[in-house]
Amino acid sequence: MRGAMTELSMAKLDRVLETALYVDDLERAARFYIDVLALEPLFEDERLRAFAVGGVNVLLLFRRGVSATTARLPGGTIPPHDGSGPLHVAFGIGDEELAGWEARLEAHQIAVEGRTAWPRGGHSIYFRDPDGHLVELATRGLWKIY
């Protein structure tokens, strides 16, 4: 029993690898994340687009409804998932980059809906993507770990 407990206690999660948003117009959403947020495309098909974020995370954009049934792939299956309504995603940015991001959003005619100064010293700005999802750009000082 002691060996089993040791194995269990050593099991650790490394990071959130993928975050998914569900969109009505896949091409429109992809253009937003490429043009406005400068994300690097990793993969695309008729169901989804995948983007690299910071070299270690992946943002997935699924065409709304297509993932609500089991996806059958050559290597196995992906169980159903979907989302509705305005969801939230936050991206980390450097302190010195906040003003540049605000200027970039203004250049793309994207309204900043909110700004927050956090007790730990971080700052966040909030805006919407074309599907109404709330996008946050946050500097360090938001959480104890970031």
Where are these regions (language model features)?
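N-terminal beta-strand motif that seeds the catalytic metal site of vicinal oxygen chelate
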Residues: 2-27, 86-89, 93, 141-146
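Helix-adjacent hinge/juxtasegments
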Residues: 64, 69-87
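Residue-level marker for the onset of beta-strands and adjacent loop->beta junctions
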Residues: 17, 37-38, 47, 87, ...
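Vicinal oxygen chelate
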Residues: 2-12, 102-146
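A generic structural signal for short beta-strands and their flanking turns/coil linkers
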Residues: 47, 57, 85-87, 108
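Short, conserved charged micro-motifs
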Residues: 28, 96-101
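Core segments of cupin and vicinal oxygen chelate
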Residues: 22-68
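Generic structural signal for helix capping and beta-alpha/helix-loop junctions
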Residues: 51, 68-69, 122, 144
